[in-house]
Amino acid sequence: MKALLIAAGVAALSSTAMAAKLDEKVPYPKADAGFTRQVIHLPKQDAEDAFKVEIIAGKTLEADCNQQRLGGELEEHTLEGWGYSYYRLDKVSGPMSTMMACPGQKKEQRFIPVVGEGFLLRYNSKLPIVVYAPKDVEVRYRIWSASEKVEKAVSE
């Protein structure tokens, strides 16, 4: 009897975990051909309004000593009937680069970020951040937090 209760408990927990993961993605459309759907699940924070999420999309490319960037815009879309936001990075241009001489330096594989508008998002641990990006683009992220110290401007 005890073994049966343990087995039933394990089965219930595993099906709940699977259902929770699937339910979070159900309303979001599948990725179009040539795109991937990349998902970020944020941990709950106290005072989430003091946090932001920076989306850092990019590609790993061979690069020299110059500063390199890709161009693009992360566009917010709303899931009809649900009101959930998702984000789409349609076009990635570049790379753009500074033009310094790099004598004697070998090129190496580096992560080159996409810069543009829309990459700083509100922190909300209740919903996943869903990003559709071209297949050759990797999505990374960074959490920003505000200092509790607030400074006062000086009249001049």
Curated annotation (Swiss-Prot):
Cysteine-cysteine disulfides: C65-C102
Subcellular localization(s) per the UniProt record: Periplasm
Gene Ontology CC: periplasmic space
Keyword terms of this UniProt record: Disulfide bond, Periplasm, Protease inhibitor, Serine protease inhibitor, Signal
Pfam families, per the entry: Ecotin (PF03974)
InterPro entries, per database record: Ecotin_C, Ecotin_sf, Prot_inh_ecotin, Prot_inh_ecotin_gammaproteobac
HAMAP family to which the protein is assigned, alphabetical: Ecotin
Family listed: Belongs to the protease inhibitor I11 (ecotin) family.
PANTHER family: ECOTIN, PTHR35890
Subunit structure: Homodimer.
Role noted for this protein: General inhibitor of family S1 serine proteases.
Name recorded for this polypeptide: Ecotin
Species for this entry: Pseudomonas aeruginosa (strain LESB58)
Gene label: eco
